[in-house]
Amino acid sequence: MIDDHYKMGLMAAEGYLELGMPEEALREFQNLPRDVKLGVEGLTLLMEIHRAEEEWEAMESVAERIWEAEPENVTHWIDWAIALRLSNSPSSARVLLLEALEKFPEEAIVHYHLACCECQLGNLPSAREHLMESKKRCRICRVLALTDEGELQPIWTDYSAPQFQC
């Protein structure tokens, strides 16, 4: 259990992140005691700092440690997969997400991120299947797909290409 003094430090760092100030968030993080830094809350904060700084390999390393601490939480699988994909390991992210799908078969967000991986790998039929499955299971995934900033671009490009039949 984290005492109130250190909760304030975590909250201050989270506030800095929300304000787009990752350097200040890191400074707050560094002032936390070692046991808080190494707990899931502290590691999650550090992972988010790395995400904000686009330090994908560092994010991947921390995300894996969080996943090891709490493998029953689907969010940790997703965070680790995102970090793998963004650090140019989409095939590793895909393997991890397929494992997550076995463990969490009803989780739409796993399908959504599998669609992103499959797009990056050029497997558009599989990407479409996972995207359709995610949208069927969760309205939020529909919004994610519609507001996508490029991860699913190969699907949209493929849909807009003229279809000729010989």
Predicted segments — roles?
Residues 4-35, 41-52:
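Alpha-helical segment of the N-proximal tetratricopeptide repeat
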Residues 41-103:
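Alpha-helical adaptor scaffolds
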Residues 119-143:
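TPR/TPR-like (Sel1-like) alpha-helical repeat modules
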Residues 18-19, 52, 86, 120, ...:
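Register position in tetratricopeptide repeats
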Residues 137-166:
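Terminal, low-structured helical/coil segments at or just beyond the last alpha-helical repeat
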Residues 45, 79, 113, 147-148:
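Canonical tetratricopeptide repeat
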Residues 7, 41, 75, 109, ...:
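Start-of-helix register in tetratricopeptide repeats
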